[in-house]
Amino acid sequence: MQIIVRDNNVDQALRALKKKLQREGVYREMKLRRHYEKPSEKRARERAAAVRRARKMERKRMERDGIK
């Protein structure tokens, strides 16, 4: 990953770097890898995330279609 420092403005470059890392999910990955996660716990976490995504998509679909 490369960030260009323009006009010796390191603060702006750091903000850009943090934004890029956030967008690519590096912080989330670091948090997950901080401790070992058992395969069963990983499956449960991923299953819960899938349920949350499905519910969110259903809510958005219902909102878009005008159903409440």
UniProtKB/Swiss-Prot annotation:
Biased composition (Basic residues): 50-59
Protein name as catalogued: Small ribosomal subunit protein bS21
Organism: Sphingopyxis alaskensis (strain DSM 13593 / LMG 18877 / RB2256) (Sphingomonas alaskensis)
Cross-referenced InterPro entries: Ribosomal_bS21, Ribosomal_bS21_CS, Ribosomal_bS21_sf
Chain intervals for the UniProt region annotation (Disordered): 35-68
Pfam families, per database record: Ribosomal_S21 (PF01165)
HAMAP family from the UniProt entry: Ribosomal_bS21
Keywords recorded for this protein, A-Z: Ribonucleoprotein, Ribosomal protein
Keyword Cell inner membrane in annotation: no
Homology family: Belongs to the bacterial ribosomal protein bS21 family.
UniProt GO BP: translation
Keyword check for Endoplasmic reticulum: no
Superkingdom of the source species: Bacteria
MF GO annotations: structural constituent of ribosome
Residue ranges, compositional bias (Basic and acidic residues): 37-49
One GO cellular component, as annotated: ribosome
NCBIfam families in UniProt: S21p
